[in-house]
Amino acid sequence: MSNFTIYHNPRCSKSRQTLEILNKKNAQVEIVLYLENPPSAKELQSLLVKLGLCSRDIIRKGEDEYKHLNLKDNNLTENELNNFMSENPKLIERPIVVKGDKAVIGRPPENVLSLF
């Protein structure tokens, strides 16, 4: 069983840098390529609890999908936002690193050090 799970996009420099930090610390890492295998809305809610954040905190507001889906609408519920992110994983901020019941966003990549 892995000590850490990283929701990783290999095309993202911050995601690669975060994974490099984990590897240098000799951490056992499960890599989830979340663009290929997006988390369900329920899994996203669990991640948010571990992050101590709400859905709006992890939505990439600069993505075209954010504008096209009108996600700026403040009347959308957490469940609705999680469903949109699950269906459009490009909207999920990256990387997210989980260890046990805690998680961080690797922006900056050094944030992951707080999990050690």
Language model features with spans:
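A structure-centric signal for secondary-structure junctions around beta-strands
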Residues: 1-3, 92-93
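Local sequence-structure signature of Cys/Sec-based thiol-disulfide redox active-site neighborhoods
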Residues: 2-21, 29-34
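Class I S-adenosyl-L-methionine
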Residues: 16-19, 23, 67, 113
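Short glycine-rich hinge loops at helix-strand junctions in the catalytic core
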Residues: 26
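Thiol/selenol-based redox catalytic cores and closely related redox-interacting motifs
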Residues: 36-116
